[in-house]
Amino acid sequence: MTTATDGFADGRLRVLVLGSTGSIGTQALEVIAANPDRFEVVGLAAGGSNLDTLRRQRAETGVTEIAIADERAAQLAGDIAYQEPDAVTRLVEETEADVVLNALVGALGLRPTLAALASGARLALANKESLVAGGPLVLQAAQPGQIVPVDSEHSALAQCLRAGTPDEVAKLVLTASGGPFRGWSAADLQEVTPEQAGAHPTWSMGPMNTLNSASLVNKGLELIETHLLFGISYERIEVVVHPQSIVHSMVTFVDGSTIAQASPPDMKLPISLALGWPRRVPGAARYCDFSQAQTWEFEPLDDEVFPAVELARHAGETGGCMTAVYNAANEEAAAAFLAGRISFPAIVGTIADVLHAADQWAVSPANVDDVLDAQRWARQRAQRAIAKASPAGACEKVSGLA
């Protein structure tokens, strides 16, 4: 395998796209197609839920190295090179790439993340769950600078941190739009439907990310990811609400300076930067327009109504496999909400219940199996909590969000 460390000096970068049919994956392929002098697709991987899109991508890119995680979907797709249970991981291990973009959804991305790091390729990481769940294992496997974040907030922090040295950093500030329920009361949230939770005010994302943003669980995952990526203690990471989603994050330095990264909400900017890091791709996104009056608002997060971020902070500070427990409990609870089995507030309530009983997992994992065991336990515990939850406030499943 080849590690890409010198930008574009040696020719086009070979990119392996995992999660190619999702929101991040499709936008990444658009970035690559718009910059054929910089990037070349060498492989695609998908879960298997959108075979028509994958077929179109195969035709457009001419790629033959393709993996589908779901065996049944792989059989329906026909001539697919990798379709075993470990298809995506094998694709990463056997395909020469300079950059592996991991945009898979959920904990499915952990083994491919570790395989990408072992290959020496740069890992453009959009699958935050693999870092949150794998934590110490992922950090141990990574070379310095090998992981480049795709999330807009972490991309912003990486850019802002260029303005100073590590010992000059006072704190990191993550921004959150506040989601579609910003300003709502806890009582109001009892009546939220999956359709309402699937409408983000500023970003266009996949269904699970959109729901996680509505519950603020996504910001909790990003808090954990921030600590792991940049090595900053949790007490030096703040979360503020910024409904316009123009300032994507900020870094405050010891002299009182605060450096912010601002751009209109468009994931193609952090995607392009992660693919070409540390060089920028011209024309990746629109500029901010300062020719007209506008207001950028910042306000504190209401932790009482939206406790997901503080639960994530607790899980991260406790350490061990607790962040994996947080993530797995959320995945179960989110699925239950979309199926109409629990109310919207019960998503975070389920996470809290599982974390409260998870003291046994406050031990660092020795291997991937330890992480998977913690997640399996968390899912089972979450399922029990969901079964006990009151159906009051639960709503019908909305097609297209589950």
UniProtKB/Swiss-Prot annotation:
Q: What molecular function terms (GO) are annotated for this protein?
A: 1-deoxy-D-xylulose-5-phosphate reductoisomerase activity; manganese ion binding; NADPH binding
Which SUPFAM superfamilies does the entry mention?
1-deoxy-D-xylulose-5-phosphate reductoisomerase, C-terminal domain (SSF69055), Glyceraldehyde-3-phosphate dehydrogenase-like, C-terminal domain (SSF55347), NAD(P)-binding Rossmann-fold domains (SSF51735)
Tell me its cofactors: Mg(2+); Mn(2+)
Q: Name one Pfam family in it.
A: DXP_reductoisom
* E.C. numbers: 1.1.1.267
Q: Which UniProt keywords apply?
A: Isoprene biosynthesis, Manganese, Metal-binding, NADP, Oxidoreductase
Sites binding Mn(2+) sit at 151, 153, 222
The residues that hold NADPH are: 21-24, 47, 50, 127, 129, 206
Q: In which pathway does it act?
A: Isoprenoid biosynthesis; isopentenyl diphosphate biosynthesis via DXP pathway; isopentenyl diphosphate from 1-deoxy-D-xylulose 5-phosphate: step 1/6
The protein's annotated catalytic reaction(s) are: 2-C-methyl-D-erythritol 4-phosphate + NADP(+) = 1-deoxy-D-xylulose 5-phosphate + NADPH + H(+)
Its recorded name reads: 1-deoxy-D-xylulose 5-phosphate reductoisomerase
Q: List the source organism.
A: Mycobacterium ulcerans (strain Agy99)
The gene coding this protein: dxr
